[in-house]
UniProtKB/Swiss-Prot annotation:
Extra remark: In plastids the F-type ATPase is also known as CF(1)CF(0).
Organism: Chlorella vulgaris (Green alga)
NCBIfam families named in the record: ATP_synt_c (TIGR01260), PRK07354.1 (NF005608)
Membrane topology, from the record: Multi-pass membrane protein
Pfam families with a match to the protein in the record: ATP-synt_C
MF GO annotations: lipid binding; proton-transporting ATP synthase activity, rotational mechanism
Name of this chain's protein: ATP synthase subunit c, chloroplastic
Cell compartment(s), UniProt: Plastid, Chloroplast thylakoid membrane
Record-annotated disulphide pairs: none
InterPro entries listed in its UniProt record: ATP_synth_csu_bac/chlpt (IPR005953), ATP_synth_F0_csu (IPR000454), ATP_synth_F0_csu_DDCD_BS (IPR020537), ATP_synth_F0_csu_sf (IPR038662), ATPase_proteolipid_c-like_dom (IPR002379), F/V-ATP_Csub_sf (IPR035921)
Function: F(1)F(0) ATP synthase produces ATP from ADP in the presence of a proton or sodium gradient. F-type ATPases consist of two structural domains, F(1) containing the extramembraneous catalytic core and F(0) containing the membrane proton channel, linked together by a central stalk and a peripheral stalk. During catalysis, ATP synthesis in the catalytic domain of F(1) is coupled via a rotary mechanism of the central stalk subunits to proton translocation. Key component of the F(0) channel; it plays a direct role in translocation across the membrane. A homomeric c-ring of between 10-14 subunits forms the central stalk rotor element with the F(1) delta and epsilon subunits.
Keyword Chaperone: no
Marked site (Reversibly protonated during proton transport) residue numbers: E61
Amino acid sequence: MNPIVAAASVIAAGLAVGLAAIGPGMGQGTAAGYAVEGIARQPEAEGKIRGALLLSFAFMESLTIYGLVVALALLFANPFAG
């Protein structure tokens, strides 16, 4: 494999994981903060808020997992190495 392609693949894999984690991380923090605020205002709605929060966490975390899949594809099944 060309060393430049190998180095670029490693850098791209690191960027894929790092950048894919920034947005969902900030979103999860914001969502959790608003969920705590909503539960503090309406304690009787805790079950609904918690259910919606966990579902939204799953959707947000899927974006990070997609970044991990791209990084693993670049490292182990590199389409540019040929």
